[in-house]
Amino acid sequence: RAAGLQTVVNSTQPDGKVNISIRGGENPIYVVDGIVMPGDAISTNGGETGLPSNVNRSGLAGLNPADIESVEILKDASAAIYGIGAANGVILITPKKGKEGSPSISYDGSYSFVRNYPYLDALNSQQYMELANVFNKENYLYNKKQYPYGPAPYDGKWSPLFSETDRLNVLDTNWKDYVLKSGYITKHNLTISGGTSKIRYYLGGSYLDQEGTVLNSGMTKYTFRGNIGVDLFPFLNFTSAFNANQKTYSNCMVGTDTGNRGDVAGSALTSALLYPPYLPLTQDDGTYTIFRSIPNPKAMEDIADKTKENEYNLNFTAHLKLYKDILSVKGVYGMNQESMRRSIFIPSDVYFSRMYKSRGNIQSERRLTQTLEAMLTFSKYMFNTVQIDALAGIGKYLESYKGYGISYEDVHDAINEHDISSAKGKFYPTSHTAKNEKRSQFFKAGFDILDKYVITATLRRDGTDKFFPGNKYALFPSVSGAWKISNENFLKSISWINLLKLRASWGKTGQDNLGSSLYGSYAPNNFKVNFSDNSIINIPYVSMRAN
């Protein structure tokens, strides 16, 4: 639990994204082992298939909760030390590390069942027909301007959509039963840790298999994490951490963005609530029934939508004592690389987005983030009254994206993505690339007087190439003061008070979570580009180019 923290799960996909709100807005900064990590997973769109563009998964899905030692939340002026991007707060995650002692091996595993929370109750066939008749009659009276919607009396010529015989001899199909199901979760965790006075190590591995509660939903995840700390000399130590994970998802249609297509490209859950209960599952010829332009909920089970993600990150830290335990310097390098491939195929016998047509999309994405920091720290207890801690540092942060994809139409169902060159329809190729760079200088000083009165000040200067020239840099100051009331003599005798502190702070934070295409770029439109005849090029205005 954390005061002021709100979480909302906005996807029923396994590993679905959790929106975290700390300061009234979403997307806080996540700092894992001192390195800022992406909070959102890389995502791909559905191309020209009509499927949702994003399946909403967490950027930290590759971090095993069993490897986490502690979590700290910064939500006031203390977040200003992280400067631009910290307007929505900061979440500090400290992974477990090895400790001096004999090797320790631990294992835990679990198997659990998952059931859907009681869902919306849809109308049965008789209720549906009765309400359809009521609505149809009211609509008739309104259009004819008959009572009570006009001066004319009812003419008695309205005929019900469903007769009494229809209502008494109708079948009843509960479409939710074709979409919702029970699931399960299997977890296995294994850790090994230990060390000596010179070397400490931690290794952790996990396996997770989850079957979702919506048709076609599921995932398999493998994670491996390790770190090692080495004291090379009394004045020099080195730590290294690494994490690798692989995730394989089966994506389900659960009601996300439909690309402004409305119910013609709605989810299986949406269709299950909209589909009339009096319709059977299949028609006389064995094909799925269709209702207007809404996809058959059960038919969506034949849509194949798979995602595979690979991620690994490396962190290196060197700490050198320049003068006793008073003055030291630290260097940090962190790298996180993610790759993802998503493949979609809609068979020709599935009516979706107002058509019977085989369609597919293959898309790959890659993201690389790098962190490089150098810090000088000072720590000393002076005059037997004041503990002084100060830090000054510089940082450079790089982020790059690259992706490509192709949508295709009219390929044989048995071939699907295995040979898209055999497709008889149109092809829609896409590609993109982007790079961002941020540079920072930061300073922090703290004074703890008599272990009762604390004063802290920070100053950070951030610059990013996301903004126009002349507006790339900004300062982010903060100051805070605290009174540890529980350390005063008049409260020490009260045993039921462990910590009582009064704190006030002021600070300035920023936001750069604005994407990488804020102004002009080369941007061909895949609907208009024709490689054999012509193309369209948008040239940015010269004064708006990035440096």
Residue ranges and their predicted role:
Residues 62, 67, 74-92, 216-229, ...:
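Conserved, well-structured beta-alpha core segment at the onset of a catalytic domain
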Residues 221, 227-236, 241-246, 254-255, ...:
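Extracellular/periplasmic, surface-exposed regions of secreted and cell-surface proteins
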Residues 1-44, 69-70, 75, 79-96:
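Extracytoplasmic beta-strand/coil segments of soluble accessory domains associated
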Residues 36, 122-123, 127-176, 268-299, ...:
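Flexible glycine-rich, low-complexity coil/linker segments exposed to the extracellular/periplasmic environment
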Residues 52-62, 222, 356-363:
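Aromatic/His-enriched, Gly/Pro-containing loop or helix-boundary segments
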Residues 3, 14, 18, 28, ...:
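Residues embedded in well-ordered regular secondary structure
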Residues 37, 207-211, 460-465:
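A short, flexible beta-alpha/helix-coil linker loop
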Residues 81-83, 101-102, 115-118, 248-251, ...:
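Switch/connector loops and helix/strand junctions flanking conserved nucleotide-binding motifs
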